[in-house]
Amino acid sequence: MVTIAAIIYEPGNSIKNKTGTWRTFRPILDNEKCVKCENCYIFCPEGAIQEDENGNFKIDYDYCKGCLICMNECPVNAITKVREEK
């Protein structure tokens, strides 16, 4: 028997599974450069970017997989990358 796709036994359970260790690159957000366009927040497929009480965006590295979509969508280059250390 061949499994064609993953089986999701409990929809919405990804919040229980920290996936931050999958990264090769870590996005670094510079709130000084950030213009609060929310592109990073909108395009993050993991919902790992949230706005704090001061209106600054923060990356939750427990769930960030390092796809760097946030960096590619930032119009002012406020997000850079660094290689993740082992």
UniProtKB/Swiss-Prot annotation:
Cofactor remark from the record: Binds 2 [4Fe-4S] clusters.
Residues reported in the UniProt entry to bind [4Fe-4S] cluster 2: C44, C64, C67, C70
InterPro entries in UniProt: 4Fe4S_Fe-S-bd (IPR017896), 4Fe4S_Fe_S_CS (IPR017900), PorD_KorD (IPR011898), Pyruvate_synthase_PorD (IPR053389)
Entry keywords, A to Z: 4Fe-4S, Electron transport, Iron, Iron-sulfur, Metal-binding, Repeat, Transport
GO molecular function, one term: 4 iron, 4 sulfur cluster binding
Binding, [4Fe-4S] cluster 1: C34, C37, C40, C74
One Pfam entry name: Fer4_21
Cofactors (names): [4Fe-4S] cluster
Domain 4Fe-4S ferredoxin-type: 25-54, 55-84
Assembly mode: Heterotetramer of one alpha, one beta, one delta and one gamma chain.
Record protein name field: Pyruvate synthase subunit PorD
